[in-house]
Structure formats: C-alpha cells, structure tokens
Amino acid sequence: MYLFINIIWRNFISKNNLPKANREIKAKEVRLVDENSEMYGVVNIREALDMAERAGLDLVEISPNAVPPVCKILDFGKFKYESKKRLHEARKKQKVVVLKEMKFKPNISIGDFETKLRKIKEFLKDGDKVKISLWFKGREILHKEVGHELFKRIELALEGLIKIDQHAKMEGKQMIMIVSPDIKV
C-alpha cells in the first residue's frame, strides 16, 4: 500500500513541475510563438494545436500566468531534457557554506596554537567559515583580557586570509569570533 501511494505521489509531484503541453492547456486563446521564436500573436487553441501538429512538434505553455497564456511550438522531450540539464548545472555550481569550529583554551601552548592555526587555514582554503571559540574554566573567566590577546594573535597570524564576520564577544563561559575566507585571496 505504501509503495503504491509513494509511486502515485512521485508522479503527481513530477507532473506538476512541468509546464502543460498540447491537450493539457485549458485556455481558449493563447499568445503563440513558433519554433523559430517568431511571434504569431493571439490565436485560438485549436489553431495553435494544428500548427504544432503540422510541424511535428508540441505546443508547450511557457507562461501560464499571462493573459492570454504564452505558448511555444517546440519539441517537448528536448525541452524537458534541457531544463533538467540546466537545473543540474545550477545545482553543481552552488557552494554550500559550512561553519567549522576550532576550540581554544586561554593557556594554550605555542605548538598547539600553531597546529590549530594550520587547521583553520585549511578550513578557509576550502571556503568554509570558521567559528573560533575560547573556553574559560572556573576562575579563568576573570581574565578576559587573556582571551582578547589570544584573538589578537589569531587575527595577526591570519591577516590577509580572513574577513571577520563577528568580532570577539562573550557568550556564557566562552568567547567567540566568526571568520570567513577573504574573497580577494
């Protein structure tokens, strides 16, 4: 039962995403554009369907919200293929920005500091944003200036590679700064 409903639902969704073609067009009159992109003007739907049939092509509703709707004579299979291909290319070009996090402590050693900086540089080269957080434990929170100094060291070490989205600020027991890769680099 579930499989049957799933198949029907998938077909319903896929058909609604496509423009109407041929006999699915319900308008009485349409603004017709032929296969050579020449405007014919407002034509009766029967006449438009006959012209498409004579050309061996389909009548496809391009702009359904216009009054009267705009229809074009073209190969519907080729149209579906090209629109699917354009959608695939657009998805390929999209870049998903990921927020990575690097945690520091106020009394970090030099070696650990440099290792974490190298990792931050890798994240930035991949085009990801980086959330740099500094965790205070116990009485360390009384010395916030240590945190500000650490963030200054990070800024100086990454100068030219980063653009600061959010400057260092306190959130509870942690200090946070968000950086992203500098577009110029």
Swiss-Prot record:
One of its GO terms (biological process) is ribosome disassembly. The keyword Membrane does not apply. The keyword Protein biosynthesis applies. Belongs to the IF-3 family. It comes from Rickettsia prowazekii (strain Madrid E). IF-3 binds to the 30S ribosomal subunit and shifts the equilibrium between 70S ribosomes and their 50S and 30S subunits in favor of the free subunits, thus enhancing the availability of 30S subunits on which protein synthesis initiation begins. Monomer. One of its GO terms (cellular component) is membrane. This is Translation initiation factor IF-3.
